[in-house]
Structure formats: structure tokens, C-alpha cells
Amino acid sequence: WDINSQRYAYDFLILDDSGKSCRGNFSNCDSYYCYGRTVLSPADGVVEEIRTDCEDSKIFSGKTDPLIRDIRGNYVLLRHTDLNNTESSPADCGQEYSLLAHLMPGSIQVKKGQRVRRGEPIAHCGNSGNSTEPHLHFQVQNGKSFYHSAGLPIHFEHVNVGPQPGYESYD
């Protein structure tokens, strides 16, 4: 991995029954099924950092733009904590962070220092940053720094995954 924090990262798209992520014009973000969809907080935590000043990237036939200022684009970084513990302050949170990146311009609904609960809307899926098409980049890391943290395995709950028509399953 070029960036250690991305070791266990996922890129989420929405595909139709034929395996396509887009209908119509492939160079238009609005044509992608996931574009503009609500992004939810993956777990309880505190908003540690946000970036909101990136426009959506142009879609270059599956290539990224090398001149992008921040590969994450618009993003929310959450530091996870037990929100049921009313005694703790944001500074008492643990060392597990979630990064949600490539968010739609103007869609971030949370502020730095805000407490969030799992399932709470935080933004909308976009195509900002180093992105070949609209999608949600999601990773968990052991520190605040994108470049100097290690990626952590992600535990999903209530997910049923099975082979879809036209796809093969591999172990």
C-alpha cells in the first residue's frame, strides 16, 4: 500500500443488475447511482476534522487528475468513543478513526467537535479529490494522520453478502 492508512479501505459504489455504476452520460456525476446519496456515520464518535472546499473532480475515463490538492477531497474524520459515557469529553476518545472521503461539495452536515451517533447522516456521496468516479471511500485507521497512521480491519454488522447474478464468488 502506498498509504498505510488505506490498507483495509473500501470504495463503495452502487451497481445496477448489469454491474454498471452509471446510467446515461459517464462524464456527468449526476448519472452515477451513488452520487448524492446520504452518507451515515459508521459508529458513535466525535468529528475530529473536516474538509469542505473541494469541487467534484472531472471524470477522465477512469483516470485521476494528478493536480488534485488533497486526494481525499471533501471528507469527515471521526474519532470513535462511547457516547453513552457522559463523563467523557471529545479529548477522551480512543485511537480509532474513520475517514469518509470524496464527499459532495456543500453536503457536509457536521461540524468539528460535534458528537455523532452511528447511523446519523453526515454528508452526501460525491466525486471530490482523487477519484475516478463518484463513490464513498471508507477506512478505519489508528491515528489522526492520513499519511502516518496504520489502517485497521473493519467489522461490519448486519451485512448479507452473496453471489449476485453475473458475478462469481471467491474466497
Regions found by a protein language model. Name each.
Residues 66-68, 90, 114, 139-171:
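Acidic, glycine-rich catalytic/binding loops that coordinate metals and/or anionic ligands
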Residues 1-68:
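Short, glycine/small-residue-enriched coil/turn segments at secondary-structure junctions
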Residues 46-104:
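Zn2+-dependent peptidoglycan hydrolase active-site motif and core
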Residues 62-64, 76, 117-130:
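Short hydrophobic beta/alpha edge segments that flank linear recognition/processing sites
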Residues 14, 49, 102-107, 127, ...:
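A residue-level detector for short acidic-glycine micro-motifs
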Residues 109-111, 127-134:
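Short glycine/proline-centered loop/turn elements that form peptide/ligand docking sites
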Residues 31-34, 102-110:
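Short alpha-helix capping/helix-loop boundary micro-motifs
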